[in-house]
Amino acid sequence: RGVVFEDLNGDGTYQRDEPGVQRVLVSNGRDVTMTNRVGAYMLPVREDMDLFVIQPSGWRVPVNERQIPQFSYTHKPGGTPEALRYGGLPDTGPAPQAVNFPLRRVEGDDRFTCAVIGDSQTYSNYEISQFRDSAIADLVARDMGGNDCMLYLGDVVGDDLELLTRIFEVGSAAGVPQWAVVGNHDIDLDATAYANSADTWRRLYGPAYYAFEIGEVTFIVLNNIYFPCGIEDADVPGREFCTESENARYNARVDNVQMEWLENLLAEIPQDRLIVIAHHAPFVSFVDAASPVHQNDNATAIYALLEGREALSLSGHTHTIENHSPGQHFEGWQEAVGVGPLPFRHIIAGAASGNWWQGDFNLDGDAQALQRMGAPKGVLMIDFAGTSYEERYVGSRLGEERGQWVDFSTPAFREWFDAINTWRNENWRERDPVPPVSINDLPDTRILTPQDLAGGTFITVNVWNGAAETLVEARINDGPAFPLTRTQEGAGEAPRIGAMFADPFAVKRQATVGRYAIESRSGEARNRGYEGFRGRAFQGPPQPQSSLADRNSHLWMGRLAEDLPEGVHRLAVTSTDRHGRTYTDQLVFEVREARPPARFRTDVWEAGARQ
């Protein structure tokens, strides 16, 4: 029991002269109740629970010095019943007689912007520094405030849970509340029971699932990382790994108690509100369409609870940007998790770490780390107005005016791609340590010969946040505009994979990473090359990062005419998103009868003066 009250003096403690706030939802993680006319509530005590208030519209819960919302009380008598690497929960003792929740009034929260951060996934303090100098630097420059928010979609850190303290301290520089989802790299991976797997997160951040409101939007945060999975999961085809694997594994699903809580919560939320479901593993994805473990087992049950409502799914996990429109579907979804055409929009928000902080350095000193489908690392920005919203993806340190890459897929590019991709797929212990080709072996894709045009040269446009509604047009010189075609229709087909569907702009930057070869005489072995994941060494000859953009749900293409005249040409490409926002890129390319030599002509130099 307790009181939800207006904290008039800002001390966080309930005084009798401070009025209660009525009709506020409070939950014990299963049951949901509403405060009465004096702000009082009563709920059953559960043996292991997070008791939390659901921040109502027009009000704000307090935040601590790290801008982490303070809206919950954790109850776990005896604490975590097993020793965990990062400590878990201490003994919380018996339940207190009352838990009161302070609120403060705010005005004008009908319009706000939320910075949605997928997979910052910092495995080290070095990577937190890169996060600080990329995504957070952009948010600070944007001058967020008022009723804006940040929402991390899980994998905030990479397995070292003590890094949570610093990363949220760094994120607090943006000056707005930091709401967060727990991901599979934010849990206690040495826990032997699901009930304990998020205990360190609960101590360092707060509940693993909860809800909050801003304006006319209800955000529902779910924990869909079930770790360790077991017999209940293994009974579902494709999840046999839950009992057969030597090491404990996770499965993507929302547990039964949480599903009960979700049903109880939705029963209290008016039908006219926008519901934003935030979770780490996507309900479904394009890039992992056939994978059971990386898509949510009980997505269809969640869809049933949301039927008839305006809803939006936000997730991370895949290190891709995927903007899936209602009605879209891909081969593999039905077989993996029983999902067909989507009932509402699903957005996988990309990754602030890009491709796990890999790749060579940008000018600002952070890794390029282009994602699995070639988009830059960055942040999804969503502007809310009432129950409407407009999403846009902002690449780190690239500015808001840029939203796509443009290049050409030539026969030479596809041959080069196949050579390096074949090498990548060989056993790394047995293959030649030096790749068969590098970026230096790729002919300039913007010098085209008649043979290139006859063999198929295509304009490629990677529209980072592209969706089914996106329109892409190209224009050569002063000629008429012509449409380009999305390489995936989203009509039930399988992901198309390979050189023909690769993004040349991204692959050029992913395929030869010079950081592998960094050496010095310092004597510190760990300063060679670079480290990623849990201290894994990336050393040796320059070679590709761990992912190449060999498939894409947001790539548009169009074939160049075979009879383009020789000379220098201008290409302009404009994409228009579903909200009418446009991005335009222009580049210069050449058509030459023969490809000129790429390097300094030493033969001419050494031949001396012409007679």
Role assignments for model-derived ranges:
Residues 70-91, 161-269, 293-314, 318-393:
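Extended active-site neighborhood of metal-dependent phosphoesterases/phosphodiesterases
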Residues 411, 433-611:
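Long, low-complexity serine/threonine/glycine- and acidic-rich segments characteristic of extracellular
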Residues 28, 48-88:
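A short, solvent-exposed loop/turn motif at the edges and junctions
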Residues 332-466, 470-473, 559-561, 571-588:
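Binuclear metal-dependent phosphoesterase catalytic core
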Residues 80-164, 610-611:
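N-terminal active-site segment of His-dependent metallophosphoesterases
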Residues 2-6, 39, 101:
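A short, amphipathic beta-strand motif
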Residues 12-20, 27-44:
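Short, acidic Ser/Thr/Gly-rich low-complexity loop/linker segments typical of extracellular
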